[in-house]
């Protein structure tokens, strides 16, 4: 499931219902701006899911943008908007998620997902995927004759 910004109550309720049906832990990864609203949006998602699915094993992790990424990648910052009601106590400059290269974001998501797959299973899935691509190319080429 993907949500942008603050997730709606309906979305969170549906997500919590789904998570409640799982027999395995749920891993929720958050990517958002590093500013008062972006950080708060992630916190609210985490709180709401735990409240709506109290018996579920939920692991929440913000994978972008983090203070460590800002420093390591020298991401461009901007002054935090003082007009944001959540700015009090946020004593850092802000960084937009868009400051991270799209390929880097894909890699962050890929790595987060790979942590949960047995290495052998990933190799098998990649081989099956490549085989399917080859078959599709064959059919496309045959259809164009």
Language-model features and meaning:
Residues 1, 29-31, 61-63:
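Hydrophobic/aromatic beta-strand patches that form the interior of the parallel beta-sheet core
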Residues 1-24:
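Acidic, glycine-rich catalytic loops of TOPRIM or P-loop NTPase phosphate-binding modules used
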Residues 6, 18, 27-29, 90, ...:
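Sequence-level detector for tyrosine residue identity
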Residues 6-9, 34-38:
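Short acidic, S/G/P-rich loop/turn micro-motifs used as interaction or catalytic elements
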Residues 11-15, 38-45, 73-75:
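A short acidic (Asp/Glu
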Residues 20-24, 48-58:
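Arginine/glycine-rich "motif VI" loop of SF2 helicases in the C-terminal RecA-like domain
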Residues 25-37:
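Acidic beta-strand-to-loop metal/phosphate-binding motif
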Residues 57-145:
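C-terminal or mid-to-C-terminal helical accessory/interaction module adjacent to the motor/catalytic core
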């Amino acid at each position: 499931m993907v949500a942008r910004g603050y997730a709606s109550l309906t979305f969170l309720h549906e997500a919590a219902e789904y998570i409640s049906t799982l027999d395995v832990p749920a891993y929720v990864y958050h990517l958002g701006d590093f500013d008062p609203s972006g950080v708060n949006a992630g916190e609210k998602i985490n709180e709401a899911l735990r409240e709506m699915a109290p018996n579920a094993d939920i692991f929440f992790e913000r994978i972008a943008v983090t203070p460590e990424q800002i420093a390591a990648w020298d991401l461009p910052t901007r002054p935090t908007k003082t007009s944001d009601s959540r700015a009090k106590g946020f004593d850092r400059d802000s960084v937009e998620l868009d400051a991270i290269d799209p390929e880097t974001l894909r890699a962050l998501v890929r790595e987060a997902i790979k942590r949960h797959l047995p290495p052998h299973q990933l190799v098998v899935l990649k081989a099956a995927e490549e085989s399917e691509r080859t078959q599709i190319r064959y059919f496309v080429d045959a259809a164009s004759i």
